[in-house]
Design a protein with these regions (language model features):
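Conserved acidic donor-binding segment of nucleotide-sugar-dependent glycosyltransferases
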Residues: 341, 346-354, 363-369
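Nucleotide-sugar-dependent
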Residues: 16, 229-233, 286-291, 298-321, ...
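Carbohydrate-associated surface elements
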Residues: 178, 198
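A charged, aromatic-enriched C-terminal amphipathic alpha-helix characteristic of glycosyltransferases
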Residues: 352, 366-399
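Membrane-proximal helix-turn-helix segments that form the acceptor-binding/catalytic region
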Residues: 94-106, 121, 125, 135, ...
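Glycosyltransferase donor-sugar binding loop
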Residues: 39-41, 250-265
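Conserved donor-binding/catalytic core segment of Leloir-type glycosyltransferases
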Residues: 213-243, 252
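Nucleotide-activated donor-binding/catalytic signature segment of Leloir-type glycosyltransferases, i.e.
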Residues: 219, 255, 263-292, 297
Length: 405
């Protein structure tokens, strides 16, 4: 079988899409290695806990927790070189970019698949050397940069890397059909294949401690989660909606709240809700599903403020559905793509519209039977359409074609 390298820009434990890809390819018989970057000691510990259990290899090309001075300096110089002089440096795209290239080049794999902005440059360089490369467009990288941030990033250079790789890569994936169509039109090529960011049904049977976040089991519960509790990701709309909700409900937020965001949080949460919002820290991925499942409604309120964000589906949307929650999601092109097929599991609301969000929440709280049916619809849609077992073969077919070409 083939030797395959998968390049990610961060920790293994946070790279759920690359993890599933690597596992599927390894289970088919390929020799798979993921190259990543370590920058956080807590996440290093999570990675090290995972490694004995996975059927592939993992190599951190840079470990910033031990030898961070030079890699951080290179990254800073790359960023400043662009910001001050408008001169492009691949180091400005992420940590360990050149280290990724050096290791992937020396390994001489049959296929190298990249998953981040910085590794786009690596794939382009490998292609120039005659190597076979692939790209998983987890995001449309040049199109997730907000207009006010554009001067800080080499958008044109990233866009040219994307266009080139869409034309030369042997393996091309996106997380939605809408993004696939848009990328195909952008590069004037056949659209990449869509593999949704869905989860395995087997996760429902994984051993995990029973967990509940709820205070009052008889009161319906809303759940929102992210790595950080910060401005954006729909929290402004949620806080604006809370005073307008007419029915009893618990609101649970999961994520880390750092010092700089605490002031924003205190200022924006309605005074009458400050003691009623339940805060939870992040947990290991293995603990997250049972905690989500203890709630009734999941919120996926990411705004489609950029074209890239509009075309994708928040991964948490599929996580909520796997856990059996009804979902209220922002009315983006990506969410529209899947909402109709869920047959009532997802309500779409205009992004950043507190009144619309409050009305959507109340519509389910007012009619508990409707909420129950929506939760059942989420389970049904997950089992029939939006699970890893349904899309795994699409990924393997794409890999087989890439390796046979």
């Amino acid at each position: 079988m083939a030797s395959i390298r998968i390049l990610i820009g961060s920790h293994l434990c946070n790279a759920t899409r690359a993890l599933r890809e690597a596992r599927a390819l390894a289970e088919t018989g390929h020799d798979v290695t993921i190259q990543g970057v370590w920058h956080d000691k807590k996440l290093v510990a999570r990675d090290e806990t995972m490694l004995p259990k996975v059927p592939f290899h993992f190599v951190p090309v840079v470990d910033l927790t031990r030898h961070g001075i030079l890699p951080r300096l290179r990254r800073r110089l790359g960023v400043e070189r662009w910001r001050r002089f408008r001169r492009f440096s691949p180091a400005g795209l992420g940590y360990g970019v050149r280290e990724h290239l050096k290791l992937a080049r020396a390994a001489e794999p049959d296929l190298t698949i990249v998953h981040s902005t910085g590794t786009l440059w690596v794939a382009a360089k490998l292609n120039e050397l005659g190597r076979r490369v692939g790209v998983d467009f987890e995001n449309w990288y040049s199109e997730i940069i907000r207009p006010e941030e554009a001067l800080l990033h080499p958008v044109t250079e990233i866009r040219e890397l994307e266009r080139k790789l869409l034309r030369v890569a042997h393996y091309r994936l996106t997380p939605t059909r809408a993004m696939a169509r848009a990328l195909g039109e952008f590069a004037h090529v056949e659209a990449p294949h869509c593999v949704y960011n869905v989860f395995p049904l087997a996760d429902l049977n994984a051993p995990a401690p029973p967990a509940t976040d709820r205070r009052k089991p008889r009161v319906p519960s809303i759940h929102w989660f992210s790595g950080r509790i910060e401005p954006g990701r729909g929290l402004r709309a949620l806080f604006g909606a809370l005073p307008h909700i007419q029915y009893p409900v618990e609101v649970h937020l999961r994520g880390d709240l750092n010092r700089q965001d605490k002031a924003w949080f205190a200022k924006n949460v309605p005074a009458e809700w400050r003691q009623r919002i339940v805060m939870h820290p992040t947990v290991h991925n293995s603990e997250l599903l049972p905690r989500i499942a203890s709630h009734d409604i999941g919120l996926a309120l990411e705004s489609g403020a950029t074209r890239g964000r509009d075309l994708t589906v928040a991964k948490k949307t599929f996580h909520y559905m796997l856990a059996g929650l009804a979902v209220i999601a922002s009315d983006t092109t990506g969410h529209e793509e899947i909402a109709e097929s869920t047959q009532g599991a997802i309500k779409l609301v205009q992004p950043d519209n507190p009144a619309a969000l409050a009305a959507a929440i109340d519509a389910w709280l007012a009619f508990p039977e409707h909420l129950r049916l929506a939760k059942l619809a989420a389970v049904r849609a997950t089992k029939e359409i939006y699970c890893w077992e349904r899309v795994r073969e699409q990924l393997l077919d794409e890999a087989a074609l890439a390796l046979a070409d």
